[in-house]
Amino acid sequence: MPNFEQNQVIAVGLSGGVDSSVAALVLKEKGYEVIGLFMQNWETDSKDPFCTAEQDLSDAKAIADHIGIPLYVVNFSKAYWNHVFQHCLDEFAQGRTPNPDVWCNREIKFKSLLDHAKKLGATHLATGHYACIQNENNEYRLLKSNDSHKDQSYFLHLLNQYQLANSVFPIGGYQKSEVRAIAKKRGFINHAKKDSTGICFIGERKFKDFLNEFLLAKPGNIETSEGKIIGKHDGIMFYTVGQRKGLHIGGRPDAGEAPWYVVDKDVKRNVLIVVQGYEHPLLYSQELTCTNLHWIRDTEPSFPLTCKAKTRCRQADQTCVVTRLDNDHCHVQFEHPQRAITRGQSVVFYLGNECLGGGIIN
């Protein structure tokens, strides 16, 4: 984390979780003037049993009081709906699998929230992300966290130079275990609070039930890769490539007991295509194309580019060669076949510890 002048005001996005809480504490103990910002991105009924926003706000207030910083509540639900949620609905409707966290970081946390922090007099916005920012002659690099298991650079790959220049990740150099230990030692009420998982606006409710509230499901056939109908699906928007659960196919006399997996979605025919066995060859691909390219540095890399890539956040880095197709498309050739490459997800590129940027798999 860079050293700033002691009289600078830094705003911290306090979510009620342990990571942002310790991020605020680290800044406070370094002598900065810290203010907390709690985002409300989703309008919910206070009686909604699946929404944790009320408890999260209560935890954020308790932490702010404990540390001794002011906390402001800001509502970005309209911006979130327009710039994140509507985009996700469009992607689901077209049979793709979007990543809301990627868009939320670019459009809400490091845009709307950063702008709000500036209006309050803050010079920078800090969050509890596990990532690092390095300034090299006023060019900002996004680096992986010291905790490889918690690294979140994948979700931050759409950030630009302005956003990185005005952001701080105070716990990027910490291990998650260290963060929890600090929180416990300081008596934070959320020191053992579990990490949030899944899609933020769905919470713990069933994905299918939630999506049904906004999109019209169209049931259709489930076919094998040979074109044989073996079942019915509830709507292809509910499924993603590599998925096993929820197919309700089971073992078949003519196919044995090996489980079935989604291998593709034929949107035009409204057909879900499946194959049998986790290691089925059709679940693997050695190449992909991507669009909506974004490079974090102002100058994009030279092509063809030999680097590492991830097609999902917890995947180990994979060696690949990236080739420019046009201004907005790249071809990615992997050294080894990759399982369950999914349209709508992000492919993110790395050179060593540096996140270069990425694109959307299509």
UniProtKB/Swiss-Prot annotation:
Binding site for ATP: 13-20, 39, 128
Active-site residues (renumbered): 104, 200
InterPro entries: MnmA-like, MnmA-like_C, MnmA-like_central, MnmA-like_central_sf, Rossmann-like_a/b/a_fold
GO BP terms, alphabetized: tRNA wobble position uridine thiolation
Site (Interaction with tRNA): 129, 345
Gene3D superfamilies listed in its UniProt record: Adenine nucleotide alpha hydrolases-like domains, HUPs, Translation factors
Keywords: ATP-binding, Cytoplasm, Disulfide bond, Nucleotide-binding, RNA-binding, Transferase, tRNA processing, tRNA-binding
Matching Pfam families: tRNA_Me_trans, tRNA_Me_trans_C, tRNA_Me_trans_M
Location of the region described as Interaction with target base in tRNA in the Swiss-Prot/TrEMBL record: 99-101
Region listing for Interaction with tRNA, in residue ranges: 150-152
One GO MF term attached to the UniProt entry: tRNA-uridine 2-sulfurtransferase activity
Record field: catalytic activity: S-sulfanyl-L-cysteinyl-[protein] + uridine(34) in tRNA + AH2 + ATP = 2-thiouridine(34) in tRNA + L-cysteinyl-[protein] + A + AMP + diphosphate + H(+)
Subcellular location: Cytoplasm
Cellular component aspect of the GO annotation: cytoplasm
EC number(s) from the headed UniProt entry: 2.8.1.13
Disulfide feature: 104-200
Signal sequence bounds: none
Protein purpose: Catalyzes the 2-thiolation of uridine at the wobble position (U34) of tRNA, leading to the formation of s(2)U34.
PANTHER family: MITOCHONDRIAL TRNA-SPECIFIC 2-THIOURIDYLASE 1 (PTHR11933:SF5), TRNA 5-METHYLAMINOMETHYL-2-THIOURIDYLATE -METHYLTRANSFERASE (PTHR11933)
Similarity remark: Belongs to the MnmA/TRMU family.
Full protein name: tRNA-specific 2-thiouridylase MnmA
Higher taxonomy: Bacteria, Pseudomonadati, Pseudomonadota, Gammaproteobacteria, Legionellales
